[in-house]
Amino acid sequence: MRRVIQTEVDVSLEKDGYILAGKVDLLLGGDGKLELLDFKTSPRPKDSPELIAAYERQLCTYAHILERRHGRHVDRLLLYWTSEPLKEDALMVLPYDPRRVEEAGQHFDDTVRRIQAQEFEVKTPPEAAICKECDLRMLCHAEGIITREARG
C-alpha cells in the first residue's frame, strides 16, 4: 500500500568540490519500498523521447542523492502529468536502473569538472529560436562562442 512520506523534499549531497541539490515533489512508501514522484504540469508528451530521458535523469539524480546520503534504496521512479484528464494517462512509471542512477551522479561530476577547468566549448549550437530568446546571446556573439553564421 502506497502512502505519502513527504512532499517538496529538499535533497542534497556534498560531492568533491560542490553540492548537488534538488527538490523531490513527492516521496511515496509502503511495504518497505520507496518511490520518487515528480509532477509535470504539461500533458504527457506523445512523441518526445528526449524530454522523457531528461526527466528520467532528473529522477535518477534524486535517487543518487538519496542513496548516497541517506542509504535509502529507491524502488520506482514516477512522473505524473497533471494536465492529463485520465489518471491512467497521467501516471508514467520509469524503469529503475542502478546504472542510470550512477550515470546521473557521474554526469554532474563531469559537468562540474569541466566548469572548474573553464571548458566552455559549445560542441552543438542550439537552434536559432533558442538563441533568440537567450539572455546571454550577446556574450556568445561577442566572445565568438556561438555564431549564427556557423549554424546556417
Label each region the model flagged.
Residues 64-152:
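Metal-dependent nuclease catalytic regions and adjoining charged, substrate-binding loops involved
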Residues 19-21, 54, 126:
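A generic fold-level signal
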Residues 55-58, 104:
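Hydrophobic (often cysteine-bearing) scaffold residues that line and stabilize catalytic clefts
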Residues 15, 51-54, 123:
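Residue-level marker of regulatory loop/turn positions in helix-turn-helix DNA-binding domains and
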Residues 1-46, 72-76:
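Catalytic cores of nuclease domains that cleave nucleic-acid phosphodiester backbones
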Residues 57-65:
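Short amphipathic alpha-helical face segments that pack within enzyme cores
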Residues 46-54, 96:
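Short, contiguous acidic/charged loop-to-helix segments that flank catalytic cores in large enzymes
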Residues 21-23, 56, 93:
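Well-ordered beta-strand positions in beta-sheet-rich domains
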